[in-house]
């Protein structure tokens, strides 16, 4: 795959990396003066006319231009007049020159836009009443603002056959205006060259040439950037209008990136999920699982408490009965006879409440499903388990070493950042692990974990590359630590990071060592002192086990005593609920105000978008009620009080949208030398090798029919998925 040459002057494609500050004197000396409707503005050389206009607050209409994509200049809607110039110019593609006076609202500019709009509408169908883009359509808005008030077109309009590009994106290509935003997104951001144009003139069409599924984990973003109704959401088709929905700003929990989202709801139901801008995390993109798995929120839900009767069947009961049974068992067992496992979608408030409850019955056996080595520094030092360079920090790096991970499917937005830096900043990438398609070229160093020791000792050729790097990153996937030699892998990895800091030109504030987590709850659980992995429970099986959203299948009935009493608290009847003796229905992430900490250690909040179904309640409230009935009342009654408790245990958990610097790398490396360094010969194989492994990874996405359709389409082809006959 060839790298795309990029004009460095374009905003969005060449933003200065975070932390890099240009001196004021140098910048000021390079500025040139131009005028926008007579108003003076100082801009850098190479700035386009459109960017200069935006700098003074003048909005120029556009369809093909997008801040994060290369310039195409297809639509011509941004035509403006330059004083004394013979013709109007395309503002998105024309760099300004000193002394230019740009006339955005002159008669010449208006006539040019009206002409362009008339040509765009000549073949555009009058579908607005049935188009899902209605109400948020750029063509609607701009035709009202900049178009003519009458039509001169009397001939027939062209018709284009719709394309089937999978179960997520609905295509009505007669509406397409050939802006090529989707093509540029696929090629530049997603790194998948599936979309392109065929034909020319009136016969030009956008599609996949050979009809096939648009195979990308970021494919849904072409819906957002399409300025018309040519590309819309299949699951959302004909369900709601944008002005009918209530929008709630929230956080995604489908992975550990913590993408910012907007949850659109109507009549107590999630209608769709859209991205929300956050430059340091997801920019303005989200993954397909984040966007489309929401239908899993209304399927296989636990809506009422359940208990197992004398026949061994789970039956519905009241909250009073369920909590009384659990409280009675809590009063019967103490200490090591009580244990808990937290799942991947649990919020920090529920984690601290469960921790306090078990501590009050003299138990500290609190585990997570995900394993993380505790030998050496383990989880005692926060820098040992965070993505310390930060997600946005990838854009500053010059070398990235990926170990035992497939970031394309484990953390799609992190992978998109790597691709962005590879494309624009000549980033060099290397991989230790199974060869996978990462949407960018990389040096495959092998799949043996022993390569880590070779790099650490300096005997591997890539050691020299890391030594010469100014801002290197080494990224270890948490999936590589699930192995029996996870501690040795982490020790070797830590040794590489520390050696780079000592021998290369790394500055003091640059972080080299990074752990890429896969699940949303892991960092908060480690911050609160949970033990990673369930080995402690397997060695000393408890008499009472509390499963808090634990649906990873990390423990079964066979691992526990026959008389072990199991409580499951969660929102889906997935893996954990069927083995439980009592089920307490909890709330999903769209139904509660909760705290999650992403892989870089950034605390963020979800907000209540809809109420929990049936009798389900927020997790921390259930645990608080249980503690009162059990006679070990927890000292908080409100959400604010729970968060005060969070602050007592780990202050960073309530410093929202902030990253606390972690600086104990040298100490962690010294402690790692005490670890058994024996590595296994087994190759490093990430669990999500292909896109088929990406779609269904947790209880919500496994309950989603849309995600099931995606798996079927990938396996059998897009034609295998039957879609309802709709317009």
UniProtKB/Swiss-Prot annotation:
Gene Ontology BP annotations: cellular respiration; mitochondrial electron transport, NADH to ubiquinone; mitochondrial respiratory chain complex I assembly
Positions with a binding annotation for [4Fe-4S] cluster 1: 124, 128, 131, 137
Ranges that cross the membrane: none
Main location group: mitochondrion
Protein localization: Mitochondrion inner membrane
Residue range of the transit peptide in the UniProt record, numbered on this chain: 1-23
Annotated residues for binding of [4Fe-4S] cluster 2: 176, 179, 182, 226
Pfam entry (one): Fer4_NDSU1
Membrane-protein topology: Peripheral membrane protein
Signal sequence residues: none
Catalytic activity: a ubiquinone + NADH + 5 H(+)(in) = a ubiquinol + NAD(+) + 4 H(+)(out)
Gene Ontology CC annotation, any one: mitochondrial intermembrane space
UniProt modified residues of type N6-acetyllysine: 84, 467, 499, 709
Cofactor: [2Fe-2S] cluster; [4Fe-4S] cluster
PROSITE patterns: 2FE2S_FER_2, 4FE4S_HC3, 4FE4S_MOW_BIS_MGD, COMPLEX1_75K_1, COMPLEX1_75K_2, COMPLEX1_75K_3
The organism's place on the tree of life at top rank: Eukaryota
Residues annotated to bind [2Fe-2S] cluster: 64, 75, 78, 92
Keywords from the named record: 2Fe-2S, 4Fe-4S, Acetylation, Electron transport, Iron, Iron-sulfur, Membrane, Metal-binding, Mitochondrion, Mitochondrion inner membrane, NAD, Oxidoreductase, Respiratory chain, Transit peptide, Translocase, Transport, Ubiquinone
Protein purpose: Core subunit of the mitochondrial membrane respiratory chain NADH dehydrogenase (Complex I) which catalyzes electron transfer from NADH through the respiratory chain, using ubiquinone as an electron acceptor. Essential for catalysing the entry and efficient transfer of electrons within complex I. Plays a key role in the assembly and stability of complex I and participates in the association of complex I with ubiquinol-cytochrome reductase complex (Complex III) to form supercomplexes.
Subunit (UniProt): Core subunit of respiratory chain NADH dehydrogenase (Complex I) which is composed of 45 different subunits. This is the largest subunit of complex I and it is a component of the iron-sulfur (IP) fragment of the enzyme. Complex I associates with ubiquinol-cytochrome reductase complex (Complex III) to form supercomplexes. Interacts with MDM2 and AKAP1.
Family in the record: Belongs to the complex I 75 kDa subunit family.
Name of the protein described by the UniProt record: NADH-ubiquinone oxidoreductase 75 kDa subunit, mitochondrial
Organism: Pongo abelii (Sumatran orangutan)
């Amino acid at each position: 795959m060839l790298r795309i040459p990029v004009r460095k002057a374009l905003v969005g494609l060449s933003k200065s990396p975070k932390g890099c500050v240009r001196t004021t004197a140098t910048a000021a000396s390079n500025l040139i003066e131009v005028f926008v409707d007579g108003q003076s503005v100082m801009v850098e050389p190479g700035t386009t006319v459109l960017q200069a206009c935006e700098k003074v607050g003048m909005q120029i209409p556009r369809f093909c231009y997008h801040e994060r994509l290369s310039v195409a200049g297809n639509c011509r809607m941004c035509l403006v007049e330059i004083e004394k110039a013979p013709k109007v110019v395309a503002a998105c593609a024309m760099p300004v020159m000193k002394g230019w006076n740009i006339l955005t609202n002159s008669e010449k500019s208006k006539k040019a836009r009206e002409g362009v709009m008339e040509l765009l509408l000549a073949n555009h169908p009058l579908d607005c009443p049935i188009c899902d883009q209605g109400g948020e359509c750029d063509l609607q808005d701009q035709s009202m603002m900049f178009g003519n008030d009458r039509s001169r077109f009397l001939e027939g309009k062209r018709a284009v056959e719709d394309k089937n590009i999978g179960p997520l994106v609905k295509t009505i290509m007669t509406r397409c205006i050939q802006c090529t935003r989707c093509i540029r997104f696929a090629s530049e951001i997603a790194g998948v060259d599936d979309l392109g144009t065929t034909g020319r003139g009136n016969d030009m069409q956008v599609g996949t040439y050979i009809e096939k599924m648009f195979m990308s984990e970021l494919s849904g973003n072409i819906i957002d950037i399409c300025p018309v109704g040519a590309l819309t959401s299949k699951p959302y088709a004909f369900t709601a209008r944008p002005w009918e929905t209530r929008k709630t700003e929230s956080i995604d929990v489908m992975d550990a990136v913590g993408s910012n989202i907007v949850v659109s709801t109507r009549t107590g139901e999630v209608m769709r999920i859209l991205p929300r801008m956050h430059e340091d995390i997801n920019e303005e993109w989200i993954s397909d699982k984040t966007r489309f798995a929401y239908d899993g929120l209304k399927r296989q839900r636990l809506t009422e408490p359940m208990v197992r009767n004398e026949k061994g069947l789970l039956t519905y009961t009241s909250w009073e009965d369920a909590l009384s049974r659990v409280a009675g068992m809590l009063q019967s067992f103490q200490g090591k006879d009580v244990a808990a496992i937290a799942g991947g979608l649990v919020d920090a408030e529920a984690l601290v409440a469960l921790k306090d409850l078990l501590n009050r019955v003299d138990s500290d056996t609190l585990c997570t499903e995900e394993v993380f080595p505790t030998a050496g520094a383990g989880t005692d030092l926060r820098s040992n388990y965070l993505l310390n360079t930060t997600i946005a920090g990838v854009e500053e790096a010059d070398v990235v070493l990926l170990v035992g991970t497939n970031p394309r499917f484990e953390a799609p937005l992190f992978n998109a950042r790597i691709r962005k830096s590879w494309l624009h900043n000549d980033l060099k990438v290397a991989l230790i692990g199974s060869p996978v398609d990462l949407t960018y070229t990389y040096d495959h160093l092998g799949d043996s974990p022993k390569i880590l020791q070779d790099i650490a000792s300096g005997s591997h050729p890539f050691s020299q590359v890391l030594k010469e790097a100014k801002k290197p990153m080494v990224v270890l996937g948490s999936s590589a630590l699930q192995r029996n030699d996870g501690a040795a892998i982490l020790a070797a990895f830590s040794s590489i990071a520390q050696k780079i800091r000592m021998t290369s030109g790394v500055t003091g504030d640059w972080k080299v060592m990074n752990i890429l987590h896969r699940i949303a709850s892991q960092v908060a659980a480690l911050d609160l002192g949970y033990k990673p992995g369930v080995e402690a429970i397997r060695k000393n099986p408890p008499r009472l086990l509390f499963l808090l959203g634990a649906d990873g299948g990390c423990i079964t009935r066979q691992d526990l005593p026959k008389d072990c009493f199991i409580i499951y608290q969660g929102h889906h009847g997935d893996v954990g609920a069927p083995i439980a003796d009592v089920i307490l229905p909890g709330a999903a992430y769209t139904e509660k105000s909760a705290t999650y900490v992403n892989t870089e250690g950034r605390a963020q909040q979800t907000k209540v978008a809809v109420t929990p179904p049936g009798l389900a309640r927020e997790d921390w409230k259930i645990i608080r009620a249980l503690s009162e009935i059990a006679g070990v009342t927890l000292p908080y009654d409100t959400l604010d009080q729970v968060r005060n408790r969070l602050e007592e245990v780990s202050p960073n958990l309530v410093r929202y949208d902030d990253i606390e610097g972690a600086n104990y790398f040298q100490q962690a490396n010294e402690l790692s030398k005490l670890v058994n360094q024996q590595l296994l010969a087994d190759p490093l194989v990430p669990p999500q090798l292909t896109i088929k492994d990406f779609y269904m990874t947790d209880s919500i996405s496994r309950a989603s029919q849309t995600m099931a359709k995606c798996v079927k389409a990938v396996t059998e082809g897009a034609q295998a998925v039957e879609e309802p006959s709709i317009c």
